[in-house]
Amino acid sequence: PYATQPREGRGKDAADWYRINPHRLHLGVVGFEGLNPAELTEIDQTLDLMDGVIRSSFTTEGEKIAVTTACDPDADRFTATIEGKKHLPIAIRFAYPTGAHTDDASNWAADEKHSTELVASTEQSATLLRTIDTARYYVRLDWTGKATIAQKGRNHFTLTPEEDRWTIAAHFTPQETKATAEQQDILAVEGAATAFWNNFWMKGGVVDFSHCTDPRAKELERRVVLSQYLLAVQCAGPTPPQETGLTYNSWFGKFHLEMIYWHQAQFALYGHEDLLLRTLKWYHSAADGARHIAERQGFEGLRWMKMTDPDAMEAPSKVGSFLIWQQPHLIHLAELVYRATKDEAVLKNYYDLVMKTAEFMYSFATYDEANDRYILKGIIAAQETLRASENVNPPMELSSWHYGLSTAQLWRERMGEPRVAEWDTLLAKLSPLAKDAEGKLYLASEDATDSYTNIRFISDHPAVTGALGMYPESRLLDKEIMNNTIDKIFEVWNWDETW
């Protein structure tokens, strides 16, 4: 059985509930109290990529305010050092979650449904207890100099300084951090952030287009380097990132395993495999859930879910439950880490997961006895306009199956184990990419013979290109035909309906 979405009745209600829950919480908003953006002048803000700090300044009522913000690289804590003769109060506000599909996860009109309690304080610290339904977490505030904390509402506090220069720190944690007279060393956070980011840039690779003659090169370089920073900030946590990172909430805050490749494969290629390993550890804890899905559906090994959460629960979906292109990602990412490190510990740590992932891939493929080949069917392709009931042999998935099983065999050899004969048989007999009648273009799938005239097949992801764009060249495809296919896609694709 597949975890789908019934259209009505209790089944629909249950599926909707499991899609929404658990959902992401907004932990809190810390900012200046009562400022009117329209009244601010001389606004300037600079992100210092090298040191990992944001320097901001503005003028309000004739007084200049300067702020330096940094995040602790080892804890869910940030600091802000504020300078100015006008002693602006800081607001610490909390919202109730929305449970919505796409938003900022903040419902500011439900104060009565959650609470914030000041449970401890000293002259330079305070601990707030947040209670939202059955969820509890703490916010530890520390500051330098003299400041006064006050409760302005059920879930609204202010901290008003008496100094021209002071620093505030906010630490979000599931466990209470006792407020004591001995202040936490908040001034060290900025230095720790700078050390982390200096090491990030000096240790890893950075693109350099300075010798390019194309006038667009400088802007492209800026975007690529900024993306390296943004991905490190937003996509290097203990779980795979949601599609919109940390800035915004999408899909109820849940993450999609087919997307981890886009967000995190680059870490291993830029020399930051340690950041990728932070997330890959999650697959160990998720293995039981993946095993249960495979068993429930009659397959071997581990079937990695599409839409999930930190506890690896499979979200019901009329589309996601039929996707398979997330399946080889664990093998792909583990291989990239091994190539980057040549560390046998990586092989030992991920060997079982790689084998169990490949076991599912072998058991999922169907042997077509009439044509003496293996096929992939009963799936929705990465190009989600293809229907599970019709779709046979989408090209990117074929390439991913060939790559995943080939790499799993390579891991066996590295570990001194024999190759699995059945996997080699599948690799030898896996269907090549389907071509049009003239043999000049690759199709969206074997059944989609009108791939470049039917609007359904020229919308959504142009996933056929991923067969070579994401995976190495193999016997399944011909580069000349792929080049023809790319040219055709640029000629006819419905770009207004693609993503």
Where are these regions (language model features)?
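Acidic/polar, glycine-enriched structural segments that form the non-catalytic walls/loops
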Residues: 1-254, 273, 284-291
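Primarily short, surface-exposed interaction patches in extracytoplasmic proteins
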Residues: 208-217, 221, 239-253, 263, ...
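Structural recognition of the beta-strand scaffold that forms the well-ordered cores
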Residues: 231, 274-278, 284, 291-296, ...
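Secretory-pathway/luminal and periplasmic proteins that interact with or process carbohydrate-rich
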Residues: 231-239, 254-256, 275, 288-293, ...
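Carbohydrate-binding/catalytic loop surfaces
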Residues: 244-254, 298-319, 372-396, 440-455
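Active-site core of glycosidic bond-cleaving carbohydrate-active enzymes
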Residues: 256-289, 310-313, 323-340, 344, ...
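Acidic/histidine-rich catalytic neighborhood
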Residues: 356, 360-411
